[in-house]
Amino acid sequence: MILAAVANGGSLDDVSKGVDFFHQLKQAGNYVPIIGTAATVKAGTTPVLFEWDYLSTSHGKDISGWKIFVPANATIGGYYAQAVNKDAPHPASARLWEEYLYSDEGQNLWLKGGARPVRQAAMEKSGKIDSAAAAALPKITGTPQFPTQDQQTKAGDYVAANWSKAVS
């Protein structure tokens, strides 16, 4: 929703333009109210998906002619949060796992899966990046915007309050 909002004149703080965009899709008969997957795309049920580029990258392996479009004016990023529970049975093992995830090897595994590693710039500079996997990523232009947790919460609240009347 945040991507649709930013692409249509909204912002990380104002997702109303995103809800309006989906309302316009509904009015035009182009909104399909199902969760799209590679299977629904193959079947022709959902010819367009709004999803993270790393998920779309995986569809290209299964769907002939699959294309990924990242709007230049609305590149939105997000991080996965990692945590170690101090009361875990083996917190040292959990810390080692975290170290592995953020090691060059772990980051290159994220990259091979189509995700953009958080340490990508540093790994490119040091020559530790898997250059073939990096080259396979969808091209983006512009600087990604990263919504804060507060912005995501407010966006979710707005969508919860306004979605059904927009697409019903």
Task: Please place each PLM-identified region on the residue numbering.
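Extracytoplasmic ligand-binding site segments that recognize negatively charged/polar headgroups
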Residues: 1-45
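Extracytoplasmic/periplasmic, Sec-exported soluble proteins
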Residues: 10, 14, 29, 33, ...
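Solvent-exposed, polar/charged alpha-helical surfaces in well-ordered, non-transmembrane soluble domains
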Residues: 20-23, 39, 43, 95-99, ...
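Loop/turn elements at helix/coil->beta-strand transitions in domains of secreted/extracellular proteins
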Residues: 27, 44-47, 64-66, 92-94
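Alpha-helix capping/helix-boundary segments
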Residues: 37, 54-56, 106
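A ligand-binding cleft/hinge motif common to bilobed small-molecule-binding domains
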Residues: 42, 48-65
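Mature extracytoplasmic/periplasmic domains
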Residues: 76, 80, 85-143
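Extracellular/periplasmic bilobal clamshell ligand-binding domains
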Residues: 127-168
